[in-house]
């Protein structure tokens, strides 16, 4: 009889170990910045995913405000709170070493989301959930190059230079350009992901008398800013082709209206679901992939209505 009781107690304790772990699970999330359109969709989707679990999973969101030191401090705070897992959207993809070390030393699972650290040799217990930014640049530029007939001048609106999404999207663009020697880069400058900055840069280029046939933007926000600058300058819609990345609601609307020729859909829900699901599995000691890739998809006038 005592043996049966012991087995029953063991089974009950195991049940509580797994069930209560989910009900009481707390995940610390450090976002590079709250004041970013696409990252807002990512954060909201994370929250929705966490609430979708039967018992719910508690997320503690922190805003790093584009400050590397602040982000590290947030991660160290998560460690001291003994959270069950940590999710980080890094401010600077070249400055993640101390974040990784802090989580690994504490034995807390770490998931990097949306932005993959520059150091690809991540230790056990550290996973990335992202999309291949090289493909995004390749997809937007290939579509543009074909629409341009393989010739003309382009300007490139770069994102934050501390972010390897900027580097890789632009690298993808330039890889495609090697097949089109008659397409030249007239200008490339950083608009730091901002609609206002994208608008200012394009307005400045127009004021300087620079001529270009297309604008290749690392994201939709800067692309929309470019479209606004061209419109204000009296340039006919569609005479300068514009490509973005993200597929935000504003970006989708711009494609539908013809302000943008093309965008590339970055799946905020897919990355959010993947990051939280992976963090939960790691906290429960379940096996996960070392890298989870969420595919990009091309957005054109012909298929824009299929995206939400």
Describe the function of each predicted region.
Residues 1-23:
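Gram-negative bacterial Sec-dependent N-terminal signal peptides
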Residues 21-308:
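A residue-level marker of the well-folded mature domains of exported/periplasmic proteins
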């Amino acid at each position: 009889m005592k043996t049966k009781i012991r087995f029953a107690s063991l089974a009950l304790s195991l049940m509580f170990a797994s069930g209560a772990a989910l009900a009481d699970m707390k995940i610390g999330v450090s976002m590079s910045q709250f004041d970013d359109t696409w990252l807002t969709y990512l954060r909201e989707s994370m929250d929705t995913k966490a609430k979708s679990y039967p018992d719910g999973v508690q997320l503690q969101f922190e805003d790093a405000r584009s400050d590397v030191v602040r982000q590290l401090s947030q991660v160290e705070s998560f460690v001291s709170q003994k959270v069950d897992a940590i999710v980080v959207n890094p401010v600077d993809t070249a400055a993640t070493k101390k974040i990784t070390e802090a989580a690994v030393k504490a034995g807390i699972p770490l998931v990097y989301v949306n932005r993959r650290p520059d150091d690809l040799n991540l230790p056990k217990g550290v996973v990335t959930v992202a999309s291949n930014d090289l493909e995004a640049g390749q997809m937007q530029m290939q579509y543009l190059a074909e629409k341009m007939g393989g010739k003309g001048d382009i300007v490139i609106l770069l994102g934050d230079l501390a972010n390897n999404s900027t580097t890789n999207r632009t690298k993808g663009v330039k890889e495609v350009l090697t097949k089109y020697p008659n397409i030249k880069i007239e200008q490339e400058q950083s608009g730091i992901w901002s609609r206002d900055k994208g608008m200012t840069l394009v307005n400045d280029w127009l004021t300087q008398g620079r001529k270009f046939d297309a604008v290749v933007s690392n994201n939709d926000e800067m692309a929309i800013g470019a479209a606004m600058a061209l419109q204000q300058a009296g340039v006919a819609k569609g005479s300068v082709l514009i490509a973005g990345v993200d597929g935000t609601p504003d970006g989708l609307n711009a494609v539908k209206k013809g302000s943008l020729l093309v965008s590339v859909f970055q799946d905020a829900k897919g990355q959010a679901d993947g990051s939280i699901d992976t963090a939960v599995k790691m906290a429960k000691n379940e096996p996960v992939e070392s890298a989870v890739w969420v595919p990009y998809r091309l957005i054109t006038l012909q298929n824009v209505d299929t995206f939400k």
